[in-house]
A protein has these predicted regions:
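Conserved active-site regions of diverse hydrolases
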Residues: 2-38, 46, 82, 86, ...
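Long, intrinsically disordered low-complexity tandem-repeat segments
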Residues: 33-92
Length: 460
């Protein structure tokens, strides 16, 4: 009985348990006591990604924020461009009353490197000596209605062109006023002087007076040695006045000596005569070389010497050269062959002087190369006429007649001189002078390069 009671009690306990937890009997896997969250965490379902802790890992990768790129120079508005690149306005040039107020790309390009320019040469460089001495015929520059100087100066300019010469562009590049002619009595020579004489020759004056080829000049032409005599006097009386030898030598370092084309008149007067042009070439260059040597002996340290352009391409020489003696481009073969001889001798002599006087900078300005660079590619320079003259006798070939030169009765002026190489059949237009200067300064038509003049000097 007692056993029966015990068994009945045990069964009652089991029955109560089944009623309270019915799943216990059906799923043996769950025959475990329920988890207490304090004792252990719930099982991790197939490695779910744990939530990010901002302290432990980076935020979701926004476009990769690598180390911030080095700050590009803060893109503030770009700085104003240097004045050399298209300035908004061209500065006004302060010029003496006798100068044109027309700025050029050369203006002040090398300002401060030289304080004085002294020039020699012929009508391609003369700014008034021949005019002041009365050695130019009346049809050129004496009349107030003269076409000479009309493009730039608008009045008598004392220049044998419609405007500026190469030497005018050179002084403009150096930031200096135009050069007054030595024969202008009231001129200020503080920044230089021009000794060039239109019509000047290198050979004996009486030789050419016998040939009776006067062209634009009256009487017997003066020689290049006259210019040298003027310079010697000027150096003593003005340039180095009151200075001892050392101080004079120092002052001469600030001077640029410009020796323009010399010999053009020798060739022009001799063409068609019995004098061989090759002899003229060899003889005339001797005087140019002597001029350079004398300048060096007198203390010159910076010298530019212009060679001759192809004179056989001037309307003057073409007009007196038979067709059979002209080359394919219409130029005089004989004249140009002689010019080549002249230039070769001149360059060889200058090279010798560079070796003998290493402290002197001697530049050869290659006028032959510069001229052909322009003539052979006229469209590039907006030139339409390479053989015709702008101012001359329209009824003749090339608008040129030796008996009716520019300014004479019956002559006329072209509408736009900038489209012509030749102004009057002998002298270049201002436009051509500008392009020649550009070739010297910017296009390797100087040997050594024009910039060599500035290497030994610092602008003041």
């Amino acid at each position: 009985m007692t056993n029966f009671k015990c068994i009945s009690l045990l069964l009652a306990i089991v029955l109560v348990s089944l009623i309270l937890n019915p799943t216990f009997a059906h799923n043996p896997k769950h025959n475990r006591p329920p988890r207490d969250p304090k004792d252990c965490p719930p099982p991790i379902p197939k490695k779910p990604k744990p939530p990010r802790d901002p302290k432990d890992c980076p935020p979701p990768q926004e476009p990769k924020q690598d180390p911030p790129p080095p700050e590009e120079p803060k893109q503030e508005p770009p700085p104003p461009k240097e004045p050399t690149q298209d300035p908004p306005e061209e500065p006004k040039i302060v010029t003496p009353s006798n100068e044109p107020e027309k700025p050029t790309p050369f203006h002040n390009l090398y300002i401060g490197y030289f304080s004085i320019v002294i020039a020699f040469g012929d009508s391609y460089t003369d700014t008034g000596n021949a005019q002041y001495m009365g050695s130019i015929t009346i049809t050129t520059t004496e009349s107030s209605s003269s076409p000479y100087g009309s493009t730039t100066f608008g009045k008598k300019s004392n220049r044998l062109s419609d405007g500026r010469l190469v030497i005018d562009f050179i002084t403009d590049a150096l930031g200096l006023p135009t050069l007054p002619p030595y024969k202008e009595t009231k001129a200020n020579f503080d920044n230089g002087v021009n000794f060039a004489i239109a019509g000047a020759t290198t050979l004996a004056n009486d030789l050419f007076s016998k040939l009776k080829r006067i062209f634009l000049w009256k009487g017997t032409p003066l020689g290049i040695m006259t210019e040298l005599d003027w310079y010697k006097k000027y150096q003593i009386d003005q340039l180095c006045k009151g200075l001892d030898q050392k101080a004079c030598a120092e002052k001469l370092k600030t001077v640029l000596f410009w020796v323009g084309e010399i010999g053009i008149n020798d060739f022009s007067r001799a063409v068609g005569s019995k004098i061989p042009l090759s002899s003229i070439a060899k003889s005339s260059v001797t005087y140019t070389v002597e001029l350079v040597r004398t300048l060096i002996r007198n203390g010159a340290k910076n010298i530019v010497v212009q060679g001759l352009p192809p004179l056989g391409c001037l309307p003057l020489d073409i007009s007196i050269t038979p067709l059979s003696l002209r080359d394919r481009s219409g130029c005089s073969q004989i004249v140009n062959a002689a010019v080549v001889i002249h230039n070769q001798i001149l360059q060889a002599k200058l090279e010798l002087y560079r070796k003998l006087f290493p402290d002197v900078t001697i530049i050869y300005a290659d006028s032959w190369k510069a001229f052909y660079a322009i003539r052979n590619n006229p469209q590039k320079y907006k030139i339409q006429e390479v053989n015709k003259t702008c101012c001359g006798f329209k009824q003749d070939d090339m608008n040129f007649n030796l008996q009716s030169l520019c300014g004479a009765s019956g002559t006329s002026i072209c509408d736009d001189p900038s489209k012509y190489i030749s102004w009057d059949g002998i002298h270049p237009t201002e436009s051509m002078n500008y392009h020649m200067t550009d070739q010297y300064i910017n296009h390797q038509c100087c040997n050594p390069p024009f910039q060599e003049l500035m290497k030994k000097k610092a602008p003041k």
